[in-house]
Amino acid sequence: MTALTLLVLSSLMLAACSGQAEQTNEKTRTITHEAGKTKVPEHPKKVVALEYSFVDALDELGITPVGIAQENKTDVSGLLGKDIAFTEVGTRQQPNLEVISSLQPDLIIGDFNRHKGIYKQLQEIAPTIILKSRNATYEENIDSFKTIAEAVGKTKQMDDRLALHEERLNAAKKKVDPNDDRKVMVGVFRADSLTAHGETSFDGELLEKIGIENAVTKTAEPTVTITLEQMVKWDPDVIFMAEADPKLLKEWKNNPLWNQITAVKNGEVYEVNRDLWTRYRGLDAAEQIVDEAIQLLQQK
């Protein structure tokens, strides 16, 4: 073995040892989440977010993720109201683990509903926390925001933003007539069914918080698939229609039962943006939802 070879090998060993020492000495914090406990870097620099509300939370805290899962090219810009630089890492339904790994993240944030099944695979790539967003309540989404802030070391920014959020919701609540007893339903008309967002859904619980009651109560899940007959039974006074599949809507409108619904009889069926009302689930989205709901309700 030549002196040059020995020198090269020694250099590589020193570099490896140095890297391991640096990794070992890096400060971490333990985060409790839906899939257990994870040690994350004290100041994560390369975060991958696999759900829109997590992207929103990071943006509120002044952090731009290096990788984001999205279905459409305009989803993130629509969510944030601005363009940011990031790498697409597949869709929320099917994240691309290879792309995520190539980014060498130091924190991955996944959704309990969508990603608990691949938690171990994500954890092999980088420290991963699993939080509630999809099919979760408003308060559960707030808790997820708090956990993200803790994970990235931005609790002061979190406290300030939540205080502003509460202030805005309290201001909105004052605009709601306490004598208005109309009950609302948020519904997504798909090709073959309607998904109703009940009182424990993100938007349902949010609206209840400012004094707008939900017609869909005592459901097993925050969102439920219902028939026209069930809709007649719940009989909402107001329907916020977050996306209307033309085929199903036409079919229902041709059914005499449709005209028995109070909201239909009174002309209180309003089309609202599905992304805003049912997909984003962030603080800014929540504030926009309550403002729009109040505006629509005050038209009558």
Give the predicted meaning of each segment:
Residues T2-A3, A15-S53, K156-V184, A244, ...:
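Bacterial Sec-exported substrate-binding components of ABC uptake systems
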Residues H33-A35, V89-L97, T219-L228:
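Short helix-initiation/N-cap motifs at beta->coil->alpha
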Residues K39-P44, G81-E88, I210-A220:
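A local structural motif
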Residues E51-V99:
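A short, structured surface patch at a secondary-structure boundary
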Residues K73-G78, T195-V224:
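Alpha-helical, coiled-coil/dimerization segments enriched in small aliphatic residues
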Residues Q104-I109, P127, M231, D235-I239:
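Proline-aspartate-enriched helix->loop->beta-strand connector
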Residues G117-F189, L276-K300:
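Extracytoplasmic substrate-binding proteins
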Residues V238-K300:
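Structured C-terminal subdomain patch of bacterial secreted/periplasmic proteins
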